[in-house]
Amino acid sequence: LGDVYKRQLSVVNAGNLREFVMELSANASMMWDMTAYDTDEFLYDFCVQYFGENHAEEVMQLYRDYYHAYWEQKNAEFPGLERQFIFHDLRYARVFKQIGERFEHFSPNPLKDIVRERVPGRSFRIEGSNQVDSLLSGMERTFGKFDKVAQRCTELMPRLLEQYRCFFRDNLSAPCHYMAALSHSLYHFLWAYKYIERRTEHLNLSIEYLEKAQEMLYSTQHGVFTDWYVGDSLHGKFNIPAKLKQLYKLRDRYGKTEM
């Protein structure tokens, strides 16, 4: 085919429109004019539009630091593709589920690919010979990063004009607080799984942080989004209530044995 028939292709994988407004807006801008598209320019314009010019650059940096707080559990395979692999929240959910179901029998490599996985190892993409140690190290690094960005979001919130605060909370601040708490929770869950000593203490901390993560996530339910996470318990979703129930049972079981 001649040049006139050549087309640019963009592949986007987003769970839903509401949680990825900025990312999908960036893709739309890219597809409008791919040769002229510049990520920094787009993000600055986006932040000016939705958070005001006075704080646009500050919010830009928060977005960048938020994305770089995610644990990069595997090095990129494609040259020039930064952070190709990150440990997103549904991978956290799989860790809670799989280890929780085999909690009594420790294994340094307890995680298996999901049933429908077509590429071996793709479900988790964890490098190293010891999954549990890699996760503990990764969570310890990542929750510190999320904590710092979440604190900066909290400090910026009252300085934003009232008209910008709702979207800032829903699109950046709440997700960051959610991931911070989730990372703390998984860290303590893994600690309780690997080490018998103070197991109940760490299960209690895992519960405390997972409850906080749920609170942060559900804080974005308002207005037309009041029932946004009502389907969280469906197959393939995180299902925080089920994970909390699992943690309560483990805590109660091991709490009795440690008394």
Q: Positions of the model-derived regions?
A:
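Non-transmembrane amphipathic alpha-helical segments
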Residues: 146-160, 185-192
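Polar/charged alpha-helical tracts
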Residues: 57, 61, 137, 141, ...
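Structured mid-domain segments that build the active-site/substrate or prosthetic-cofactor binding neighborhood
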Residues: 1-152, 156
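Extended, well-ordered alpha-helical segments in internal regulatory regions
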Residues: 175-198
